Swiss-Prot record:
Family assignment from sequence similarity: Belongs to the RuBisCO small chain family.
Protein name: Ribulose bisphosphate carboxylase small subunit, chloroplastic 1
One Pfam family per UniProt: RuBisCO_small
Major localization class: plastid
InterPro entries (alphabetical): RuBisCO_ssu, RuBisCO_ssu_dom, RuBisCO_ssu_N, RuBisCO_ssu_sf
Tree of life domain: Eukaryota
Gene3D superfamilies documented for this protein: Ribulose bisphosphate carboxylase, small subunit
Keyword NADP appears in the UniProt entry: no
GO aspect biological process, one term: reductive pentose-phosphate cycle
Gene Ontology molecular function: ribulose-bisphosphate carboxylase activity
GO cellular component: chloroplast
Tagged with keyword Transit peptide: yes
Amino acid sequence: MASSIVSSAAVATRSNVAQASMVAPFTGLKSAASFPVTKKNNNVDITSLASNGGRVRCMQVWPPINMKKYETLSYLPDLSDEQLLKEVEYLLKNGWVPCLEFETEHGFVYREHNSSPGYYDGRYWTMWKLPMFGCTDGTQVLAEVQEAKNAYPQAWIRIIGFDNVRQVQCISFIAYKPEGY
C-alpha cells in the first residue's frame, strides 16, 4: 500500500512539472485567421480586436424614470385575470394562506424617515380583512381583490402567500395598480 502511494506521488510530481511548462490554447474567441481579410487597416480600433464573430446582445437595465419597482417581478407587464388566477392557484397548491394587503399612498419602497442602509419605508402595507385561512378556491381570492379595488380604486393591492407552519411570507405579487403607474 505504501509503495502505491509513493509511486502515485512520483507520477503526480512528474505530470505537474510537465503541465507547468505547457500553456493551454485559448478557445473562447474565434480565430481571426479563419475570416477572409480584404484590406489591412493600420488604424485598428481596440474594440474590434476582441470579437467572437457574433452579435453583441446586452441586457437593458431598469429605467429609473417613471418606472417604480414594486416587487421582485415588477419589470413584467401587469398580470391579466387569468394569470392572477394561476398565481393564486399555485399559492393554494403549496398550502400557503392567501392574504391581501393594500397601500393608498406609496406602493413602492422609499426612504423618508431614515437613511440607514437596508432600511426602507413602505415595506409594511395595510391588511385587507383577515388572512384567508381555509381558502381552497382561487376565485374567492380574486373576488376579494375586486372588492378591495372597488373600496380603494387609487390603492395598490398585493397578494401574499403566507406559510403558517414556517411563519414566513413565501410569495408576494402586485394584483392591482392605480391608473398611471
